UniProtKB/Swiss-Prot annotation:
The gene is tsaD. This is tRNA N6-adenosine threonylcarbamoyltransferase. Its EC number is 2.3.1.234. InterPro entries: ATPase_NBD (IPR043129), Gcp-like_dom (IPR000905), KAE1/TsaD (IPR017861), Peptidase_M22_CS (IPR017860), TsaD (IPR022450). Required for the formation of a threonylcarbamoyl group on adenosine at position 37 (t(6)A37) in tRNAs that read codons beginning with adenine. Is involved in the transfer of the threonylcarbamoyl moiety of threonylcarbamoyl-AMP (TC-AMP) to the N6 group of A37, together with TsaE and TsaB. TsaD likely plays a direct catalytic role in this reaction. It is an enzyme of class 2 (transferase). It is found in: Cytoplasm. HAMAP family: TsaD. GO terms for cellular component: cytoplasm.
Amino acid sequence: MRILGIETSCDDTGIAIYDTNKGLLINEIYNQRKLNNIYGGIIPELASREHMEAMIVLLNKIFKKKNIYKYVDMIAYTAGPGLIGSLLVGATFACSLGLSLNIPVLPVHHMEAHLLSPMLDYKTIQFPFIGLLVSGKHTQIIGAHKFGEYEILGNCLDDAAGEAFDKTAKLLGLKYPGGLELSKLASKGIKDYFYFPRPMIHHSDLNFSFSGLKTFAAQTIKKSSKSMQEKANIAKAFEDAVIDILLIKTKKALKKQKWKRLVIAGGVSANQKLRKKSEIMVKKNFNGTVFYSSLEFCTDNAAMIAYLGSLRQKEARNSQLEILVKPKWSIDDLCF
């Protein structure tokens, strides 16, 4: 079975085709980084308009590669969570295309797709496992008991880790999205030149808070000399603090659940220091294994949507005129 995946939850437009026998066949993506750099971030209305244009371009690109009318058996699209305008663009395209091709359409959960995205590389990851979802809008610790049964063990009370990365990078004068740029700058920083606080690490729960850390970084930047070395030192201190917080909480979750498998997913999972330190932590303390996806599948993409569609293909509905989206949608309640 071949599934066409459509991703438009935020500012990345993605289209992919996944074959249940051959794996991923096509994965195309268009990002809005140039536009976001102009405005210093994502403007929801502009993001929606860009999706409309990009979707046509990407679909035409796929049409040239494959005869999609004979090639696709089902369509899966991101129905939430995400920006309402962006979600509606993808959902409308998916439902319209499904209606015209007379094939089933399936709305899927964006964060479940992220959580299972490492399976694009590892094929199967045995349940149960702890999932660390770290992106621009989410920082969650998930207890994945089995496929489709997820428990939120820890949540972010304010700014997500990815958002804190981007906002701190902006204060340092780095281009958007700032997470990768901040990490590059941090690699040039002097270890322990600055020490940033680690909020909530001593709390018994598994929740996160990054707003205080972001404020501390802003105050440090304001007082700094603004030299490149000083900026690098701040970037390093900030990155070290975020990673420590994430791993301290994740370690507690693994210990609490008595599990040995950790999946790290979402845009921040591309951070190389996070990957390295998580492997050391899990191996040393639990003799366990860490799974994460290839870098191309860390940020928003349609490959993970198409793959999740393949796992949930029995739930697909015949094309209807009803367009379903759910901007606020928790992973522990997957029912529409």
